[in-house]
A protein has these predicted regions:
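Extreme N-terminal, non-catalytic leader segments
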Residues: 1-5
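Glycine-rich phosphate-binding P-loop
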Residues: 6-27
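Short beta-strand-centered segment that lines the nucleotide-binding/catalytic pocket of NTP-utilizing
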Residues: 29-45
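Loop/turn-to-beta-strand initiation segments
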Residues: 30, 103-109, 129-131
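Conserved nucleotide-binding/hydrolysis micro-motifs of P-loop NTPases
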Residues: 37-40, 113-116, 136-143
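Conserved nucleotide-sensing/catalytic segment adjacent to the nucleotide-binding pocket
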Residues: 44-105
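Conserved mixed alpha/beta catalytic, RNA-binding, or beta-rich assembly cores of soluble enzyme
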Residues: 48, 96-97, 111, 116-132, ...
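A glycine- and Lys/Arg-enriched "phosphate-lid" helix/loop adjacent to the NTP-binding pocket
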Residues: 126-167
Length: 167
């Protein structure tokens, strides 16, 4: 039987960690990893002078882009920064998936770095049961969850300032 690879993506504060944990527990999947942990490893290997976007948060990575005048809108700029940030993490995510497939182990991976179109899941389709979920919620509910989460983890002040970019 092929292993399951379940990818759960969303903006911060939507509830992907909670859902990922429930999915892993319900399906008896012993491996659950957050892309933030993978990012931390990649940051340790690639310095900020070579990858400044990687060393920012996904929601403010756009502040490191050099050619900001080439973007038609602020939304395009924010998206480009986010994709630049994620592009450093995705190869490592693909290596984690490869290892799980090789070992025939199922895994749930959750995080903001899972970007449809940037992560190449086609390479695993014959080897694993791949399921990719992108979670969304309406803006008012997201903002309420975002504030509650920021207060609970006591490190969300900056994230609240970047709610629009995070969304």
């Amino acid at each position: 039987m092929k292993p399951y690879v379940i990818l759960i993506s969303s903006a911060s504060g939507i509830g992907k960690s909670t859902i990922a944990s429930e999915v892993a527990n319900t399906l008896g999947i012993k491996y659950l990893i957050e892309t933030d942990f993978i990012r931390a490893i990649v940051r340790g290997i690639i310095g900020s002078e070579y990858a400044p976007a990687l060393h920012k948060s996904s929601y403010n990575a756009y502040t490191t882009l050099r050619d900001t005048y080439n973007f038609k809108s602020e939304e395009e700029l924010i998206t480009a920064g986010y994709e630049e940030h994620a592009s450093f993490v995705i190869p490592a995510i693909e290596k984690v998936i490869s290892r799980c497939v090789l070992d025939n182990d199922s895994i749930v991976i959750e995080g903001v770095h899972l970007v449809p179109g940037l992560i190449n899941i086609k390479q695993f389709e014959d080897l694993a049961n791949i399921h990719f979920f992108v979670l969304t919620v309406d803006e008012k509910q997201h903002q309420e969850r975002f504030i509650q989460r920021a207060l609970a983890i006591k490190r969300g002040g900056t994230q609240i300032d970047y709610f629009k970019e995070n969304r």
